[in-house]
């Protein structure tokens, strides 16, 4: 089954605060794969409509907050244009990282689980 993708024009705030938590809350498969995960992930999006967003993962539940949490398990740095290309499936995270458009700071293994959260 193909997972739903966010609208192409979704704002980062709408994506992190509403779309991601709702997508996980309505997907039992994602919840099950995140059942053993407790983590705080900060997304640092640069450029127009960018900002800091925190995603809290707690045993299958996901909550989005505006701003950067202190001492996150993982911080993901990218610009809004790259974030949009990732959301639309026009590029992959490994490709963006190789082009230095995406950078992880912290628990890299958690970074590998992001596709479970974000789709």
Language model segments and positions:
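Feature captures hydrophobic
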Residues: 1-119
């Amino acid at each position: 089954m193909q997972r739903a993708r966010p609208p192409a024009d979704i704002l980062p705030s709408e994506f992190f605060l509403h779309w991601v938590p709702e997508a996980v809350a309505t997907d039992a498969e994602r919840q099950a794969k995140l059942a053993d995960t407790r983590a705080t992930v900060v997304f640092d999006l640069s450029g127009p409509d960018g900002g800091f967003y925190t995603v809290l993962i707690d045993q299958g539940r996901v909550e989005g907050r505006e701003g950067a949490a202190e001492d996150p398990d993982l911080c993901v740095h990218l610009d809004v244009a790259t974030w949009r290309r990732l959301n639309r499936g026009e590029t992959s995270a490994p490709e963006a990282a190789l082009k230095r458009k995406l950078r992880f700071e912290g628990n890299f293994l958690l970074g590998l689980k992001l596709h479970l959260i974000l789709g």
